[in-house]
Structures are given as structure tokens and as C-alpha cells.
């Protein structure tokens, strides 16, 4: 399986690809005939660009991690989560109340919940068969 992961603006790039993977079945270029949609996506406090209003049931399974007090980024991801729910697409949401935007891997955070988020991601990857050899 091939997935995509993005933090902040990188999350916007993942969204643009995951929900608008354009392919041209009639292209002379073999690469352009392929579907570029990832098998799964991981959005960590993504920016608002590229977040669609709706998703379909075949949207890439998603892991979302962000902060409630992140002024730029929490509302669009809550809307996206609801779009996933309406489409009955696979989504896991981790919404935390503390810390600030750009906490990265959580190593510098003073909050145990933020420091532990990579393990939540590892659990999700395992539960979804993404770590099988």
C-alpha cells in the first residue's frame, strides 16, 4: 500500500492529491494513465486548502490529528470528518485540546498526549493492514 502523510501545508498537498487524483486513461504517457490516489492518507494539522466539501465512499482511509484551538486548521478538518461520516468512508479522528500548531512529532511538547500521538498513528496503520510485510 502507498499512503501519503502531510503536516500543515504538506497536509494541503496530500488533500489536493487524495481528493483530486486526475488520470487520463487515453494519455500517451503511461504515468498519466495511472490512478494517483493514495491507498490511505494521514493529515496532521493540515491547512485549509484542498479540503473538499464532500467525499465519496471510496475516499482514501484517513487518520486526522489536530488541535481544537488551532485557529487556521481545526474547523476545515472537522467538516471533512463529517463528510467522511456521511459517505461512510473510513476515518479516524484525534482532536486534542492543548498545545499549538506545528507540534511536529510531539518531542518538544510538554503534554503527554501530544508526545504520544505517533503511537496512535502506528496503531491505526497496524489496524488497517498498512504495516504488513
Predicted regions and their residues:
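Acidic beta-to-alpha connecting loop that harbors the catalytic carboxylate
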Residues: 9, 68-71, 98-100
Amino acid at each position: 500500500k502507498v499512503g501519503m502523510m502531510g503536516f500543515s501545508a504538506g497536509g494541503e498537498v496530500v488533500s489536493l492529491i487524495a481528493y483530486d487524483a486526475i488520470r487520463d486513461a487515453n494519455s500517451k504517457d503511461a504515468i498519466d494513465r495511472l490512478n494517483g490516489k493514495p491507498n490511505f492518507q494521514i493529515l496532521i494539522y493540515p491547512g485549509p486548502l484542498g479540503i473538499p466539501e464532500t467525499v465519496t465512499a471510496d475516499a482514501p482511509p484517513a487518520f486526522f490529528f489536530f488541535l481544537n484551538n488551532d485557529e487556521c486548521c481545526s474547523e476545515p478538518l472537522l467538516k471533512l470528518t463529517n463528510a467522511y461520516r456521511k459517505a461512510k468512508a473510513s476515518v479516524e479522528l484525534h482532536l486534542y485540546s492543548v498545545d499549538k500548531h506545528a507540534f511536529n512529532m510531539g518531542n518538544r511538547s510538554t503534554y503527554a498526549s501530544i508526545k504520544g500521538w505517533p503511537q496512535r498513528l502506528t496503531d491505526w496503520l497496524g489496524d488497517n493492514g498498512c504495516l504488513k510485510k
